[in-house]
Regions:
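S-adenosyl-L-methionine
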Residues: 1-12
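Conserved acidic residues
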Residues: 18-20
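A conserved beta-strand element that flanks and buttresses the S-adenosyl-L-methionine
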Residues: 23
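Short catalytic micro-motifs in class I SAM-dependent methyltransferases
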Residues: 26-30
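A short glycine-rich, Lys/Arg-flanked "PGG" loop and its adjoining helix->strand segment in the class I
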Residues: 35-50
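Conserved beta-strand signature within the Rossmann-like core of class I S-adenosyl-L-methionine
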Residues: 51-59
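Conserved Class I S-adenosyl-L-methionine
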Residues: 61-104
Length: 131
């Protein structure tokens, strides 16, 4: 049995909880607050029930017009020149309550018009919420 729901990823309704699986596809780097979305995945009123799966697919193309730089999960150098990678930021954000099961690249082709296409390689990561 499958239920599909659509809502604002940064302000999800309180009645959304205990799903077996949640898919976050190509939206994380377009949210004004990725932490608000990710923080809603677990806890007493978590979207994902214990033992459930989260699939996050993202190209990590952070842009300040969508997401303030100070809340990016990665994709930048800090003032001391250290690289911060989105993959590591995502794992850190979910790591205390989720185990990484799999990750791989997922190519994507977007047709803008008959003569222009965008080729993008997103990263797909699969996590399981700890019991």
């Amino acid at each position: 049995r499958v239920t599909f729901r659509q809502a604002d990823a940064c302000a999800l309704p309180a009645d959304l909880l205990d799903f077996d699986a949640v898919l976050l596809a190509n939206l994380l780097c377009r949210l004004p607050s990725p932490a608000a979305c990710l923080g809603r995945l677990d806890g007493d009123r978590g979207l994902v029930k214990p033992g459930g799966i989260v699939v996050v697919v993202s190209p990590y193309t952070w842009m300040e017009r969508f997401t303030p730089r100070e809340v990016w999960l990665g994709g930048y150098q800090d003032d001391e020149g250290r690289e911060h990678y989105s993959e590591e930021g995502l794992q850190a954000a979910l790591g205390k309550n989720f185990d990484l099961l799999d990750k791989h690249d997922m190519p994507l082709l977007i047709r803008e018009h008959e003569r222009k296409y965008q080729y993008i390689v997103s990263q797909a990561m699969v996590f399981r919420r700890r019991l």
